Design a protein with these regions (language model features):
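Generic structural motif
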Residues: 1-3, 70, 96, 125
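Short acidic, glycine/proline-rich loop/turn micro-motifs
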Residues: 8-12, 74-78, 127-133
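Short, well-structured alpha-helical interface segments that form or flank functional binding sites
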Residues: 27, 31, 86-88, 140, ...
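Surface-exposed patches in mature extracellular/periplasmic domains of secreted proteins
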Residues: 43-52, 161-167
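Surface-exposed short loop/turn segments
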Residues: 48-113
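C-terminal/domain-edge helix-coil "capping" segments
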Residues: 81, 95-187
Length: 187
């Protein structure tokens, strides 16, 4: 799973710099599980065909998160004693019927099968004061960015036009034609 394994590697540009590996996957999964369990009645991670089959009649929709972009700055880059992380997320929602199990147990959806698709950004920063290391500072900035993402998601989820329409229709995914029309109106 790309989301659970998310990391960014930044190779040093010169001798004075060092390589950076920022792993966010585990923290992302733990954070989003906590947030989503607080927002919804029940949350199920559908990781394989067996889980898909077990929950086929009980899941209202599937949220597919992705980290579309992650950027960071450190004092070496900016000459300011602040560590910053920017994350851009892309979320898609599909009905469970649009998730397909493959022979090898992996799951897939057709690229155009979603009924909601939206992006969201998050930002976190931390000063270097009181921190033991660069790694600790980057990790703290990532935690702040995750909190920002959670607040943004929780307060804006029901205002995403396709989500609002889905909720108004009793949590049934709208017909493909209606979703396409709504998406065109939003573009």
């Amino acid at each position: 799973d790309e989301f659970a394994q998310h990391e960014i590697f930044d190779e040093a540009a010169g001798r004075a710099e060092s390589d950076w590996l920022v792993k966010t996957g585990d923290a992302q999964v733990e954070f989003w599980n906590t947030l989503l369990n607080g927002m919804f009645q029940e949350v199920v991670q559908i990781k394989d065909s067996q889980t898909l089959e077990a929950y086929k009649n009980t899941v209202d929709a599937v949220i597919i998160p992705a980290v579309a972009d992650l950027q960071y700055t450190i004092p070496l880059h900016t000459n300011i004693k602040i560590y910053e992380i920017w994350m851009k997320y892309r979320f898609k929602m599909v009905s469970l019927e649009d998730v397909h199990g493959n022979e090898n147990g992996d799951l897939s959806i057709k690229p155009d099968q979603y009924f909601a698709d939206w992006t969201m950004t998050a930002y976190g920063k931390t000063p270097t004061a009181f921190l033991q290391s660069d790694e600790e500072a980057v990790n703290l900035a990532a935690v702040v960015a995750l909190r920002d993402a959670g607040a943004n998601f929780a307060t804006s989820f029901s205002r995403v036009p396709d989500i609002a329409a889905w909720m108004a229709e009793g949590l049934q995914p709208p017909p493909a034609e209606a979703t396409d029309i709504q998406r065109l109106e939003n573009d």
